[in-house]
Swiss-Prot record:
One matching Pfam family: BacA
Membrane-traversing stretches: 42-62, 83-103, 110-130, 142-162, 186-206, 219-239, 247-267
The protein, known as: Undecaprenyl-diphosphatase
EC annotation from Swiss-Prot or TrEMBL: 3.6.1.27
Gene Ontology terms, MF aspect: undecaprenyl-diphosphatase activity
Lipid bilayer topology: Multi-pass membrane protein
General function of this protein: Catalyzes the dephosphorylation of undecaprenyl diphosphate (UPP). Confers resistance to bacitracin.
GO cellular component, one term: plasma membrane
Presence of the UniProt keyword Hydrolase in the record: yes
Amino acid sequence: MPDWLIAIVLGLVEGLTEFIPVSSTGHLLLTKIALGLTDPAWDTFIVLIQLGAVLGVVALYFQRLWAVVVGLPTQPEARRFALTVLIGCIPAFAAGLALHGVIKHFFENPYLPQVICVSLILGGVILLVVDKKAPPPREMDGMALSLKTAALIGLFQCLSLLPGVSRSGSTIVGSMLIGVDRKAAAEFSFFMAIPIMVGAFALDLLKSYKDIDASHAGAIAIGFVVSFLSGLVVVKFLIDFVGKRGFTPFAWWRIVVGVIGLGLIYIPR
């Protein structure tokens, strides 16, 4: 398969799965394995195109985010929102920096596909239960959460360092368990994704830039644009979808993909 087509496939997988609780990294790694991509440059490629999906969030929420930036000097609400995002990101930032080498090594484990599939299944079951049994929501606005709530969500986000867990899944499940409305949980997860993924982009580029060179520029550009456009579409429609149907469809998707993945691994062909 030519590199440009691989870039389109990976860009679509990234953009379509980054902001729904199904583990974009897990799907990307399973796709990479299925396509037989062994060049380390593709690992760095996967991290780099995540920034495209994040820019989809920035584009969609630009007016609200810009209002926060402009209002920081004079508006307490803007400063409070910025502080909640910062507090929510600190635990994952710290854990990611401290464990970057360990995480990279773990992702080279020969049993990584099995770990991802099991994580998808377990995460799907947990999401299914929480979506149906979560306590009644007390906080309804993703831009006006309490500092305590933001800190607790940040701790849940650390679970996303494990393969197949899902950053959005861990933050959404954590949010709902502590009384945040579904829509607000999804939106706050979007907002936290911006600094977290920009940080992951910068850290991985700093540590792995030697794995890529000018010959990869075209594929990276294609993957970046595709992930941006597909991420934009997903974010645009996700909030209304969640309000009407909840997260149950995504829970079942995780379970089905995990079971199929294990079947492909262990059933003789």
